[in-house]
Amino acid sequence: MVSLLRLCSFLLAAGSILVQGSPIIAPSIPPCEPPSNFTGPSNFTSRPGNGASPFWLIAHRVLTKDGVKAALGHGANALEMDITGWWSGWFGDHDGLLTSAGDTVSDLFDEIASRRTQGDPVSFVWLDLKNPDFNKNGVNIVSLMILCREKLEKVGVRVLYGFYSSQTNGPSFKFVKQVMNENEAIGIDGKFETVEKDFEEKGIPLQKRVFSSGLFNPDFNFGNCEVHSSGVCAQLREGKESHEFSKVFGWTVSSYTRKDHVYKMMEVGVDGLIYGFVASHYYDHADIRHTLSTIRGWLEEHKDTHRLATVDDNPWSSMSKKGSSKSSWVKGEVPSIAH
């Protein structure tokens, strides 16, 4: 275990993890010493609610500042953002095309932080990492994590680093695993058995494990919730019943999704649903408001057992004997980085 300063020195002087043939080296700006207000524990609370299970309304594909405003205005308490690295920086970008980028991640985070300090109950930001191992011109996983900690976490917004099963052997996954702090978690999207095995083999503490399963339209492969199958509903049910994850999220609920399928996903116990458009960035629209009314309708019918999560609910908390996730990097202690 080494201090933050020693870690940064190590990365700057000799440390590297190979990303597309080039090393990730901690950038010299901002400096390695964290600012005095980097991530204060006072910004994070985890008080119990009324006994009902907290539920997260996760806005889908929030790629612009206007999308942030719309989602929070609709009552979302978490935001899913597709993140793509370009030579000029990290962007809200799902497709990675010359014309597909939204606003910069820096600007998006500034908008989220501003709304959070004004009282909007955004609990966490889910970063759907499209090319996590990108490493060009100082744009890499290190620079992204610094943005998260300086702009989001210091105002009480937690972060979920979202990977796909095909990305878990990459250097960025290993880096996040080694330096994530108490406000961060790792999500893996894929098949239940594959994801469970990945988390177990890589030694991720249970409270830091988030499993997600879904489809751009889950109706296309919804399946039978009660049997073992590759269908979306069965995958989510197995994830919840396994007790191997801190949280289980489903995706993507839209105005096209069958209402009974939305309800069944909630009945098997998912902790939240990604909702929004199937193939477009988030903005204010009647279809999105209709989708929200469907989800809220179920929550209202089950208000004795479920409630909307608040900023006082820590999504990355779970009692586990599988190990703990000690605060690292921000607090000054991190594991050594394997090359």
UniProtKB/Swiss-Prot annotation:
Cofactor(s), by name: Mg(2+)
Active site: H60
UniProt-annotated stretches for the region Disordered: 313-339
Signal peptide: 1-21
Gene3D superfamilies cross-referenced by the UniProt entry: Phosphatidylinositol (PI) phosphodiesterase
Main localisation: secreted
Motif SMD-tail mapped to chain: 309-316
E.C. number: 3.1.4.41
Subcellular compartments: Secreted
Keywords (A to Z) from UniProt: Hydrolase, Lipid degradation, Lipid metabolism, Magnesium, Metal-binding, Secreted, Signal, Virulence
Record's cofactor remark: Binds 1 Mg(2+) ion per subunit.
Catalytic activity: a sphingomyelin + H2O = an N-acylsphing-4-enine 1-phosphate + choline + H(+)
Cellular component GO terms held in the UniProt record: extracellular region
Binding annotation for Mg(2+): E80, D82, D128
A GO molecular function held by the record: metal ion binding
UniProt family annotation: Belongs to the sphingomyelinase D/phospholipase D family.
Record text about domains: The SMD-tail motif is highly conserved and may be responsible for structural stabilization.
Function: Catalyzes the hydrolysis of sphingomyelin. Sphingomyelinases D are produced by some spider in their venoms, but also by arthropods such as ticks, or pathogenic bacteria and fungi. They might play a role in pathogenicity through different mechanisms, such as membrane destabilization and host cell penetration, but also pulmonary inflammation and cutaneous lesions.
Protein name according to UniProt: Sphingomyelinase D
